C-alpha cells in the first residue's frame, strides 16, 4: 500500500507540473522542472532547497507549495507537508488533484474523516477524477464501509475505462492526421 501511495504521489506531481506551470514565466517553469527532476531522482534535500528558493520569489504559487509538500512527505515531515497542502488549496481551491493528495496524506496520518472530506471535495470539483473515487474506496475499506467502497471502485473503474478509450481514440486520430500529411 505504501508503494502504491508513493506512486500516486509521483503521478500527481507530474500531472500537476504538466497542467499548472505558467508557460509565460520561463524562470518558474525551469525551477519547477528542476524541483521535479531532483525529487524524482530522490534528491529531496536539494529539491527542498530549490523549492524554498522558488517560494521566496513566487510566494503565492500553489504548485510550489504542492511540490514542497510532496518533498516533505518523502523526508518524513508529514505535518509540514500538510501545512503546505493546506496552503496550496487556499491558493487554488479548485484543483481536485491537490484535494486527493491531501486526502491521502490525512489518511496516512490517521485522519480518515478528514481524508473522506477531501476526496468528496475532489469529486465535487471533478466528478471524473477516478483517483478520488479509488482513494475514497481505500479509506472506506479501512473504516469497514465495504458496500460504499465497492460502489466507489465501480465508478473508478468505469472512469478509467473511459479515460483509456479516450486516449486510444486520440491516438488513432493523431495517427490518421499524421498519415494524411505523408
Residue ranges of model-derived segments:
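Alpha-helical tetratricopeptide repeat
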Residues: 2-182
Amino acid at each position: 500500500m505504501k508503494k502504491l501511495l508513493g506512486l500516486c504521489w509521483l503521478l500527481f506531481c507530474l500531472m500537476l507540473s504538466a497542467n499548472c506551470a505558467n508557460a509565460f514565466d520561463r524562470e518558474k517553469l525551469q525551477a519547477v522542472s528542476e524541483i521535479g527532476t531532483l525529487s524524482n531522482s530522490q534528491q529531496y534535500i536539494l529539491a527542498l532547497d530549490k523549492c524554498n528558493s522558488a517560494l521566496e520569489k513566487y510566494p503565492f504559487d500553489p504548485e510550489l507549495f504542492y511540490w514542497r509538500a510532496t518533498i516533505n512527505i518523502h523526508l518524513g515531515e508529514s505535518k509540514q507537508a500538510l501545512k503546505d497542502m493546506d496552503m496550496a488549496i487556499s491558493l487554488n481551491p479548485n484543483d481536485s488533484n491537490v484535494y486527493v493528495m491531501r486526502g491521502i496524506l490525512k489518511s496516512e496520518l490517521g485522519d480518515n474523516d478528514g481524508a473522506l472530506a477531501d476526496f468528496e471535495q475532489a469529486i465535487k470539483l471533478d466528478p471524473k477524477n477516478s483517483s478520488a473515487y479509488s482513494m475514497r474506496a481505500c479509506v472506506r475499506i479501512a473504516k469497514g464501509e465495504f458496500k460504499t467502497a465497492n460502489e466507489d471502485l465501480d465508478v473508478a473503474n468505469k472512469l478509467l475505462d473511459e479515460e483509456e478509450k479516450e486516449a486510444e481514440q486520440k491516438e488513432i486520430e493523431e495517427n490518421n492526421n499524421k498519415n494524411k500529411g505523408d
